[in-house]
């Protein structure tokens, strides 16, 4: 091997070897245990960022480790290639989304290869190709035929100036990002998949996911939001009954008004002859409210003039349109109990409505609703026959009475809504439905799929090219003229089943069941926690759809889930003439730090003093991203990978520090130097355990302890940073160890082979070279080192000796020494015997192998 470590030469050579030998190409092998490792596939934005590098390094470390465990490992990669950014970039760069996307894929593919990730490139695909989305389209039509797909009107962001639908991220402060026109809410027909049919199973099966972070499971439980309650009817004079859902039927006797959503049919009827109410309803509709903001937003409402009749006591209560009632949740109507619900309380206080308390504290303390509602569960009063009942008894009794009178029923409700998959964008998979002239909607027959998205288009930045081109929509169905659906699928559709397509990317169907059932479920999935409620939930749903269609036998797609932390970096800015912040790249800033490493001054390349905004997530908007390419060019891929795995636990945030990268580079140089010095002296003989001295045994014990710890850290705990720290600690001992005798060299040889094998998943290129230099063959197919139980056995033990609770000495005894032998040596230790002079020993306690405690007075 060369004397100097030169990453560029080594990495290019090793990557060429992997390419030529198709090292990471796999097929199904029933004789081997399989391991499917997958990192969330990237959106081809143009260049890799450090978040990608972290995600894919973790995946590659897990894959290579499992490979050395003798498993048949599949690690695929592909491209989540549809989406809005491509449309925006196409408009900006005067091109079409397709060429922009394909160019980015080529560039990023090359970057991934330079980082040495062991992907099976034979399985690569981009979701924007008809070969991929054709199967999604066909599966959608099958779901339609099963009754799991339907169309209904739903609200979208509408720009009246551009006459176009906007995605949520295109609405800035309530206005269109392009022309600054106030955005309206518009009801348009959209396609939905009935995820709610699977709500209970999606909830129950979270308990099967033992390898998932508890936090992600909790987020999904809350998102699914199962609740038990009562659905009841209020009669409305001269109108249809009003249905409401409540989880607190115990408060029913405290209802003083009913709130309905602006989109509720009753609201529309009430507004017909009430211009003021009609205007208020419009205002509500155009104020898009996120559910999270409901608690803090200003509560507004207007009386409809309608009156509802309480189902049990017959009291008349007013019906209000209220901005905090959402049509998408429950029935779009709520029974309001101001005394026992804070939102209802604020509304009633504002509009001078009655507040009637009917629940008091169980402990008998005084009820106080002067400032806020009493929302705890308690004991009923002023509730007629239900007085004195506590929550559960009242729930059951009131529900039973409502059921007996035909006015209500116990029911389970879910917060989860059906999945709206229509997008009024161009760059997505066309929805395979047509409408004939008689208004009937039909799925496109399988023999006419895929419905291909035209790629040679001109983007005007306003209207989708397939909506603008009236000819594109014209087609036939059973020989009759028909119009195609011009909406495209939500891009979560493509990412909900891509993991399964990797199992058989060439299959002439959505999946090849035999191959899919060999590889699935994914054994290890890696990605950001921001995907907890959307992508991860939709993928679980899609997997169950595939199972029920007979394609897979498993219930869940991902066995283990690791959510990697974000990558942070220093961010700097100066204030421009208009008072805005101009962000300066940290690579263009010179900083001075105090003794504790805190930044005391920062000056950019223009000589300007800049403010340090702290360590924050790397992003384009803060201009604090570090280009992985530059780091690879400067230090090599192995150094970047090592820093990524060492600087922080995989699931915690990682602070980017170039000094840390330099440290990782120095460590690799040290390992290289020691291997080079060792191999330059020729081959070493085998370890003869029986012939080792005490010091040699101790060093060899350290080697095998390290193997045991690293194996556990990587395989079970997934604390890769502590595994690396253990190898570094061992390297420090090896560097200082004598190399005089043949057995000294034998131990070092065994140790270096173990070190190289343990570092291989993290830094594969340098380890490939060092492995060969150590006289070994083909590290990619080697075995993970195993520790020798015998080597871990200690001949001697270090025992701490205490007198009256204070440490007075340490003694070395034979590992199998008896209590009497230890006592004799301990009592005669020089410092111990000094402290026993002139006192009476009352008790001697021996904790085997650890402690001798003497009590004396």
Swiss-Prot record:
Which residues are involved in binding ATP? 620
Write out the GO cellular component annotations: cytosol
UniProt record, GO biological process: leucyl-tRNA aminoacylation
PROSITE patterns recorded for this chain? AA_TRNA_LIGASE_I
Q: Which reaction does it catalyse?
A: tRNA(Leu) + L-leucine + ATP = L-leucyl-tRNA(Leu) + AMP + diphosphate
- Where located? Cytoplasm
One GO molecular function term of this record is:
ATP binding
Task: Determine if Signal is one of this entry's keywords.
Answer: no
Motif 'HIGH' region located where?
42-52
NCBIfam families on file: leuS_bact (TIGR00396)
**Family label:** Belongs to the class-I aminoacyl-tRNA synthetase family.
Q: What is this protein called?
A: Leucine--tRNA ligase
Q: What species is this protein from?
A: Vibrio vulnificus (strain CMCP6)
């Amino acid at each position: 091997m060369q004397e100097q470590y030169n990453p560029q030469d080594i990495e290019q050579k090793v990557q060429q070897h992997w390419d030529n030998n198709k090292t990471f190409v796999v097929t199904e092998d029933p004789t081997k245990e399989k391991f499917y490792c997958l990192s969330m596939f990237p959106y081809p934005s143009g260049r890799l960022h450090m978040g990608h590098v972290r995600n894919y390094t973790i995946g590659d470390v897990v894959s290579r480790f499992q490979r050395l465990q003798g498993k048949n490992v599949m690690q695929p990669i592909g491209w989540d290639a549809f989406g809005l950014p491509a449309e925006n970039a196409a408009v900006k760069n005067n091109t079409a989304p397709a060429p922009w996307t394909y160019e980015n894929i080529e560039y990023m593919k090359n970057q991934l290869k330079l980082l040495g990730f062991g992907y099976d490139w034979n399985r690569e695909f981009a979701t924007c190709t008809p070969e991929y989305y054709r199967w999604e389209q066909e599966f959608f039509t099958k779901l339609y035929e099963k009754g799991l797909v339907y169309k209904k009107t739903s609200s979208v962001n509408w720009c009246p100036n551009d006459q176009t639908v906007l995605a949520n991220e295109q609405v800035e402060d309530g206005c269109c990002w392009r022309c600054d026109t106030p955005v309206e809410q518009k009801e348009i027909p959209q396609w939905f998949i009935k995820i709610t049919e699977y709500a209970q199973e999606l909830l129950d099966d979270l308990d099967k996911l033992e390898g998932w972070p508890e936090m992600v499971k909790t987020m999904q439980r809350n998102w699914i939001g199962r609740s038990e309650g009562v659905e009841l009817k209020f009669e409305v004079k001269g109108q249809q009954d009003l249905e409401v859902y409540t989880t607190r039927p115990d408060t029913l006797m405290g209802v003083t008004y009913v709130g309905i959503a602006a989109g509720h049919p009753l609201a529309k009827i009430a507004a017909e002859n009430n211009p003021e109410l009609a205007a208020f309803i419009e205002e509500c509709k155009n104020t898009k409210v996120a559910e999270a903001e409901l608690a803090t937003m200003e509560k507004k409402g207007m009386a409809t003039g309608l009156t509802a009749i309480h189902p049990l006591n017959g009291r008349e209560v007013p019906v209000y349109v209220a901005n905090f009632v959402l049509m998408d949740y429950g029935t779009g109507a709520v029974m309001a109990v101001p005394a026992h619900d804070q939102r209802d309380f604020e509304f009633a206080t504002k509009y001078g409505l009655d507040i009637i308390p009917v629940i008091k504290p169980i402990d008998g303390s005084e009820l106080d609703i002067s400032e806020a509602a009493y929302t705890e569960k308690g004991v009923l009063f002023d509730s007629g026959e239900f007085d004195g009942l506590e929550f559960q008894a009242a729930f059951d009794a009131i529900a039973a009475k409502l059921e007996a009178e035909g006015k209500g029923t116990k029911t389970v409700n879910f917060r989860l809504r059906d999945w709206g998959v229509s997008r009024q964008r161009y760059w997505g998979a066309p929805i395979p439905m047509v409408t004939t002239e008689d208004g009937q909607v039909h799925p496109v027959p399988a023999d006419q799929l895929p419905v291909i998205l035209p790629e040679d288009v001109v983007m005007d930045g306003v209207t989708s090219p397939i909506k603008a081109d009236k000819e594109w929509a014209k087609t036939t169905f059973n020989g009759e003229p028909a119009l195609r659906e011009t909406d495209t699928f939500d891009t979560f559709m493509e990412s909900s089943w891509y993991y399964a397509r990797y199992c058989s990317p060439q299959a002439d169907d959505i999946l090849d069941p035999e191959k899919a059932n060999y590889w699935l479920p994914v054994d290890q999935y890696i990605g950001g926690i921001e995907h907890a409620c959307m992508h991860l939930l939709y993928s679980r749903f899609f997997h169950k759809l595939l199972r029920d269609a007979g394609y897979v036998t498993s219930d869940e797609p991902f066995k283990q889930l690791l959510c990697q932390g974000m990558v942070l970096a220093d961010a700097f800015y100066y204030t421009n003439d208009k008072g805005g912040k101009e962000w300066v790249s940290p690579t263009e800033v010179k900083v001075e730090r105090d003794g504790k490493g805190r930044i005391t001054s920062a000056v950019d390349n223009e000589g300007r003093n800049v403010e340090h905004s702290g360590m924050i997530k790397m992003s384009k908007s803060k201009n604090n991203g570090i280009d992985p390419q530059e780091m690879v060019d400067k230090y090599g891929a192995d150094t970047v990978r090592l820093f990524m795995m060492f600087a922080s636990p995989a699931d915690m945030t990682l602070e980017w520090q170039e000094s840390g990268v330099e440290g990782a580079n120095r460590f690799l140089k040290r390992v290289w130097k020691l291997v080079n010095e060792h191999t330059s002296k020729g081959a070493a003989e085998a370890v003869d355990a029986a012939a080792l001295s005490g010091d040699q045994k101790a060093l060899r014990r350290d080697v095998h302890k390290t193997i045991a710890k690293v194996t556990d850290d990587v395989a079970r705990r997934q604390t890769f940073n502590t595994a690396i720290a253990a190898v570094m600690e061992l390297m420090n001992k090896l560097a200082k160890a004598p190399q005089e005798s043949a057995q000294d060299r034998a131990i070092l040889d065994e140790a270096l082979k173990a070190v190289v094998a343990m570092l291989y998943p993290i830094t594969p290129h340098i380890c490939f070279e060092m492995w060969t230099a150590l006289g070994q063959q083909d590290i990619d197919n080697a075995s993970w080192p195993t520790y020798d139980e015998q080597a871990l056995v200690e001949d001697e033990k270090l025992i701490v000796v205490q007198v009256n609770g204070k440490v007075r000495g340490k003694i070395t005894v034979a590992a199998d020494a008896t209590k009497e032998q230890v006592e004799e040596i301990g009592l005669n230790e020089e410092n111990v015997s000094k402290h026993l002079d002139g006192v009476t020993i009352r008790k001697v306690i021996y904790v085997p192998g650890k402690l001798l405690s003497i009590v004396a007075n």
